[in-house]
Amino acid sequence: MIDQSELVSFDIFDTLVSRMCKTPADVFTLVAQQYELPAEQFQTDRIQAENAAREEDRSGEIRLEDIYRHLEQRYPNASELMQAEIAMEYRVCYPNGEMTALFQYACENKTVVLTSDMYLSEPVIEKILENCRISGYRKLFLSSTLKKTKHAGDLFAHVLEACHKKPEQMLHIGDNLKSDYLIPKSKSIRAFRYVPPKKKPDSFCVPVLDAFLARKAPQEDSDFYHTFGYTVLGPAIYGYVSWIKDFLQKHDIQKVFFFAREGEFIKRAFDCIADQTFEGHYLYVSRRSLTVPAIATIHDVASFLKYRPIRDRVKVCDQIEKLGLKAADFSECSWCREETLQKTFGELQDAEKQAIIGSMFQKVQQQAKRELVLLKAYLRQEHVNQKFAVVDLGWNGSMQSALTDILSSSSEPFDMTGFFLAQRDEYYKYKDKIRNFGYLFNYGAVSPEENLLLNSGTSLLEFLFSASHGSTIQYAEKDGRICPVLDQYEFAEVYPIIRACQDGAIDFIHDFIGEFPDGAGIPCKQFFSPMYRVLQQPPQAVISHFGDICVSDMNETEIYLAEKCPVSAPKKWIRAFVNSGWKVAFLKRNLKTSHAMAMYSLLRKHFNG
């Protein structure tokens, strides 16, 4: 219909622009809540005032000023309430993506105007349109300005006259059955009725987050990674740290330690919303720097393997290095040959594998005792004692468990609570030993679908949460202080990408709390929805920007998030799939399928991906 028309007219509210509340009258409730007025009474008064103003002036559309004049007797601050209503309209209005896409298409080759029956003034409507990034229209025709309405039909006649068009040359698009469809049709104007999707009856502000992002997110031509950080990572990290803050307040915990390395970004986000009540500290620890010293406190190989699980694809020589040992330390062992050192644990016979693990446990205990002294000194220096919380990305609890063993072997009293993004499958090993809570879900209290969804994106999340420095190996004394000894930083080349994503996320937090200091009443977990959507159905742009990033660590086989690999080479393709960090994205990129998550679910059972 657009292609056959010379003049295209769009309705504004509930067509190009939506409100994040169920009904327009809910805006009045929000104003009442802001001024601590009885919400139901003010909403009723505001509606009655509008009806009275319309009865008083039947010549055309009324103005907001006319409505609030009828409220002055009951509300002495009526003028202030009117400005609050305008400000609330700015806040709750957001672009309807479905219709703005149609609007942009029409703007390419047609004369486009906006036609609305609305009591808000032209400057206010123009500001709402600007906030919603709706531009390119030729003219704005408002009933409040022209004293003509679509409902009466005279506003359409005015539009035709002003644009020098005949009725059959015009198309009007809007949501109201009478004023946007039947009336223009009766004037020989082509009309299309848009039916907005129904909003859920049990929710007041369902699309608050999506509406905010639609209004505030950087433009498409902005830096891709910053925009991704703002629209996807930002809500996710905000939801996580808001949940942490709520929990800390509820349980009267002031001291918080953020575990390196993911904790660097988490602390940066937490500091945006935290007040002076909390003592936030960044703690240089790692799985290696905690679990190796903790081995000094245990007495069996099974406990050793809980702390230092050995993966089949890791070489023997690399595992020795991770433990802070050298191959020469095992020179007296019969298995210590170059051929064996270069094998992966998956290539070893079971008897030889057990012998090597037993030797490692014996040797590392000696190393662990030396490292434990410095680690305890570092923990005392950082005041890791009394009642405190520890925060990490996740997943299984080995670091918190190791810290528990280390602190238990000291004389310092402690009461530790841990926070994860989620508790994953291996958490069962430590669930009876540590106190820990998951933001998205706790171990054993999650649906298989959500568990699978998060599992599919673990490598992407770990990359996005990465710090600006290498992992902590151990500790050393320097100038009277205990300092972390850091490994080489593996993400130096791609850190600008990480930083851009994280900067975008922090910008989101600042913007969101600036507009909604109380979080807009959105449950904390709901903020993870944009991230879950990306994990469930990765957009092609996201795959192409992240797929070729190498996320390998621990000296393993190179792992790319979702590298391009032709299916025509099956063995290579299978190997690439098994080694990919983000398998759903890998499947979608290489198979061009919209069912990548379902395929991942099936293939994971086969390949144990």
Predicted regions and their residues:
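Active-site neighborhood of HAD-like aspartate-dependent phosphohydrolases
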Residues: 2-45
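Nucleic acid-processing catalytic cores of prokaryotic defense/repair systems
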Residues: 19, 27-31, 103, 118, ...
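N-terminal accessory alpha/beta regions
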Residues: 45-66
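Short, acidic loop-to-helix structural element flanking the phosphoryl-transfer center
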Residues: 59-114
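Substrate-recognition "cap/lid" segment bordering the active-site pocket of phosphatases
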Residues: 113-115, 119-169
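Long, low-complexity, Lys/Arg-enriched
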Residues: 157-173, 181-182, 186-609
